[in-house]
Amino acid sequence: MSQRGRATRPTGPTGRPRRTGGQRSAGRVSRGGDLASRRARLHEVVEPVVGEAGYDLEELSISRAGRRHVVQVIVDADGGIDLDAVADVSRAVSAALDAAEEARGDIVAGEYQLEVSSPGVSRPLTLPRHWRRNAGRLVRVTVRGGPDAGDRQLTGRVVEADDEQVVLETDAGRAGWSYAELGPGRVQVEFTRPGETDGADGADEAGDFDDDDDVEGEER
């Protein structure tokens, strides 16, 4: 589902954006900066809003798309996040960006598209909370070898995970691995998981094929 809206700017008689203080000063233009500095300013605004809503900011990116920017915000929580929650976060982030621009000037120079979503199945598991939130899923991961052994690939089901290690069930049995021993994990798509009947959770599994489970977009 994608819900789109448009935020309007004050315009003059010609329909172009009204300049409230003559030509933009060199200092104001420099606030646009490069993508890295814009991302840093966005992070300052967005992360507190997402945290206050009770979610984790998993990723924040900004890129060019023609004549506008695309701001992508990925959020998650224990138990996942549904479309209604994504929409709530999208509105809160949009309002915070509006307020920040009123107070501090352009956060993102020019028009931009705001996209808020939950992580898709393609998101690599790099933090303890990523592994914890994927308990029960089949994961493929690289096990780092020691000085006398090379890396190897391992496929196993996530049994449990804490801040120190993850326990995986493999064909060889159950074993715990510290995160330092593992590379990023990759969730493997399954049509039927153990303990599920065919078709019982088909609607849930269909979402595994999307890069983002739920997306809320707003054009600005």
From Swiss-Prot:
Extent of Acidic residues compositional bias: 198-220
Bias-annotated ranges (Low complexity): 1-15
Top-rank taxon, per record: Bacteria
GO cellular component, one term: cytosol
InterPro entries attached to this UniProt entry: Ribosome_maturation_RimP (IPR003728), RimP_C (IPR028998), RimP_C_sf (IPR036847), RimP_N (IPR028989), RimP_N_sf (IPR035956)
Cellular location(s): Cytoplasm
Pfam families xrefs: DUF150_C, RimP_N
KW Cytoplasm (keyword) present: yes
Keywords: Cytoplasm, Ribosome biogenesis
GO BP field: ribosomal small subunit assembly; translation
Sequence segments annotated as region (Disordered): 1-35, 184-220
Record-stated family: Belongs to the RimP family.
Name of this protein: Ribosome maturation factor RimP
Species the sequence originates in: Salinispora tropica (strain ATCC BAA-916 / DSM 44818 / JCM 13857 / NBRC 105044 / CNB-440)
Gene: rimP
